[in-house]
From Swiss-Prot:
Name the record gives this protein: Glucosamine-6-phosphate deaminase
Active site: 62, 128, 130, 135
UniProt record similarity statement: Belongs to the glucosamine/galactosamine-6-phosphate isomerase family. NagB subfamily.
Pathway note: Amino-sugar metabolism; N-acetylneuraminate degradation; D-fructose 6-phosphate from N-acetylneuraminate: step 5/5
UniProt source species: Streptococcus pneumoniae (strain Hungary19A-6)
EC number: 3.5.99.6
InterPro entries per record: Glc/Gal-6P_isomerase (IPR006148), Glucosamine6P_isomerase (IPR004547), Glucosamine6P_isomerase_CS (IPR018321), NagB/RpiA_transferase-like (IPR037171)
Cysteine disulfide links: none
Keywords: Carbohydrate metabolism, Hydrolase
Phylogenetic placement of the source organism: Bacteria, Bacillati, Bacillota, Bacilli, Lactobacillales
Catalyzed reactions: alpha-D-glucosamine 6-phosphate + H2O = beta-D-fructose 6-phosphate + NH4(+)
GO molecular function (one): glucosamine-6-phosphate deaminase activity
GO cellular component: cytoplasm
Top enzyme class: hydrolase
Amino acid sequence: MKVIKVENQVQGGKVAFEILKEKLANGAQTLGLATGSSPLEFYKEIVESDLDFSNLTSVNLDEYVGLDGDNPQSYRYFMQENLFNQKPFKESFLPRGVKDNAEAEVERYNQILADHPVDLQILGIGRNGHIGFNEPGTPFDSQTHLVELDQSTIEANARFFAKIEDVPTQAISMGIKNILDAKSIILFAYGESKAEAIAGTVSGPVTENLPASSLQNHPDVTIIADAEALSLLEK
């Protein structure tokens, strides 16, 4: 596991983009993508580059259950606004946030992941150490599944909604096994609120109580983080 300290998210996006260019030069075809504020500067680097992504495939980590793709709070909408509209991919897959028959959607998405092995997976991290929407207690051998969101996750995401009651309580998420199947992983972490989770991810015990600690079992993980997120690790 490699840890790169950056001044801010802008620098973090540039560092990640250099890693991406190296992976693409070595034949990467499929990118695993994440939402949230952490990867935004990385996506900006992609959009502003002259690289052609029209032969690449993307698969996203997760999607809320109950939000249509046209809903501004859906992750499909987020990806369209921040990346896909400006930099089209050959194919872009996201879980469908269907309320009915979620089991069929889980099966469909696991097949997509089997058909499109991820070369580089992008991650953020939750305050409780979740990656994707894999909350504490998620088995490390889990594949795509329906998730009941932790209250801390709902509270953290409430800032994106008019009121906390509007935040979906369920999501469909890649499982930890799906994430670890990626050849390479970049995890972004910014701010003091992520410090405890990062300390456990890098140097704590590998435990299902901290989903991101599973990354210690992966051979090629790069953590890009600022001083605040690394503050407990450096003490």
